[in-house]
Amino acid sequence: MIRRLACAAALLALAACGGDGEYGRTSFVAAGDIASGCWRGDEATARLLDDIDAPVVATLGDNVYPSGTDREFRQCYDRSWGRFLDRTRPSVGNHEYKTKDASGYFNYFGERAGPRGKGWYSYDHEGWHLVVLNSDEPLDRGTEQHQWLVRDLERNRGTKCTLAYFHHPRWSSGKHGGKERVLDAYRALYDGGADVLLTGHDHHYERFAPLDPVGRVDPERGIRTFVVGTGGAPSYRMRATEPHSEALGDDVRGVLRMVFHPDRYEWEFVAIPGRRFHDEGRGECH
């Protein structure tokens, strides 16, 4: 059931971009919570990726269920999203850690997953800086990962637009809700000038207004956060809608496509056929 639809005047801009794929030029596409055993939602979202034809496919954790084993990656993930492996930039989720040290994840993605046993890394794409974190490893201030994040953001201060992604959301109206465990990382991203944050974990789609680390609307410096746990796994029941949630779709599967510009971005949530939920819009970098 669709709880709320958000309308924005970006459809014409997205359609006018031109370029590759049925959807016009696309810079980047993302979703998490993907391949779930005999459930075939991941095959439906993979067909969307065929049509969108983005140069970067980002995963937002929980790539395969239930335990992220080598066998599950081969037999489940690989048959659907695996065909985009050469352009995938993954992040790891809690279900991968049901296998010791998330070994199935690191074995499957190899160097694409960042340093083995860590899983955090960054890269540049179309003039944007993208930061991938491991929210199953400590992110508190002073930890190895947090220190790396602060240094990485400082080194890339000259980049106008920054996007980060990891598995556990800072805010969510879904079953699991927002996680305090990522607060220090969110604060570092905010201080470092990040513009967009993508997460998964809860199996729905949600978009929040640009917020500061304690959840206040901040149009000037706030990070626009998305929950995109819609890669194929079964949906969860929703809780009460969190403050400043601007778009919310449950019982929906699909992917978030983005178009990057030097100082701004456009987004569009594309649902699988038969699901009528849609969200799109645009934002400016800080």
Per-range role (PLM):
Residues 10-18:
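Hydrophobic h-region of N-terminal signal peptides that target proteins for export
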Residues 132, 265-269:
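Short hydrophobic/aromatic-rich beta-strand segments that constitute the beta-sheet cores
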